Swiss-Prot record:
This is Protein PsiE homolog. The gene is psiE. It comes from Bacillus subtilis (strain 168). The lineage of its organism: Bacteria, Bacillati, Bacillota, Bacilli, Bacillales. The chain crosses the membrane at residues 12-34, 56-76, 84-104, 109-129. One of its GO terms (cellular component) is plasma membrane. InterPro entries: P_starv_induced_PsiE (IPR009315), P_starv_induced_PsiE-like (IPR020948).
Length: 138
């Protein structure tokens, strides 16, 4: 009996370790978000004077900005919802990542098609998860 009582504290210790690590990850992501914001501001400033023809790089950086933002929002939601990661935030991050991939690497039409199908699958999964939640609530 005494041996099992010691292991009852293990989940709490692991939860505390996870919380500390997520806190530092949120700080690092916040620093990267600020850095990305500065890069976007500089890019816009330079493009005003140089008349850049291609804005794919700018759009890619903007989507990276949103991915940092979504990861930070996911960590905030984790702490606000009693240490639970909502599924929809992972789907948002996945959709944003695939859209960035399509914008950056769109040379082959068939791969773009399959990436678009991946987005469609994530959207369908999102609606199924939301429908299940609304049925459970009613």
């Amino acid at each position: 009996m005494r041996f099992s009582n010691k292991f009852k504290k293990v989940p709490y210790l692991l939860q505390a370790l996870l919380n500390v690590c997520l806190f530092f990850l949120a700080l690092a992501l916040s620093a990267l978000l600020i850095s990305e914001t500065w890069y976007i501001v500089l890019f816009v400033y330079k493009s005003l004077f140089n008349k850049v023809d291609s804005y794919y790089e700018m759009l890619g950086e903007l989507l990276i900005f949103f991915m940092y933002f979504e990861f930070i929002a996911l960590i905030i939601k984790y702490f606000k919802s009693d240490f639970h990661f909502p599924l929809r935030y992972f789907i948002y991050i996945g959709i944003t990542a695939v859209i960035r991939l399509i914008i950056i690497d769109h040379d082959q039409a068939i791969s773009t098609f399959w990436w678009a199908m991946a987005i469609l699958a994530m959207i369908c999964g999102f609606f199924i998860a939301n429908r299940r939640n609304s049925v459970v609530e009613h």
